[in-house]
Amino acid sequence: LNAVDFGVPQQRERVILVGMKGENNYIFPVPTHGPGKKPYVTLKDAIGDLPQLKSGESASHYAGVAENEFLRFVRAGAGQLVTEHAAPKNGAHLIRIMQTLQDGQSKDDLPEEIRPKSGYGNTYAKLWWERPSTTITRNFACPSSSRCIHPRDSRARSIREGARLQSVPDDYR
């Protein structure tokens, strides 16, 4: 199962085992998104209504309306204010790295003079604005441990953005 095929805005592949005693009448869910179905929910679709932030900034008001099915779902019942939308504060060198990268690029695409010397291929990597996110990990806001750099704002993801990419409604506390 890949969560992106069911309207979740991230690639998240998992194996699901169903154990049943007796009759085998379990009906597996049918994917709702993908080729020939609804389009995948992209990063832009999922977080495009949130205010732009710089490193260390926060915001409490939505920047746009809930203009798609996903946003109407996550914003239902949330009111007028957005919570937990604060960007982690980063140092000047990391900010320069994040500003240099383009959509989908990683540390391997950086000039030698600012390229981190260690880390896996998907570290210090920028997400794609027009695609679903890669799988979220517990370090979803740490550029040195995952592909988590915001493609528009050149910063790490906020908690609200991480929650959105897991389809957690905005009113969840």
Where would I find each of the regions flagged by the language model?
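C-terminal target-recognition/interaction regions appended to catalytic cores
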Residues: 65-173
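Class I S-adenosyl-L-methionine
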Residues: 1-116
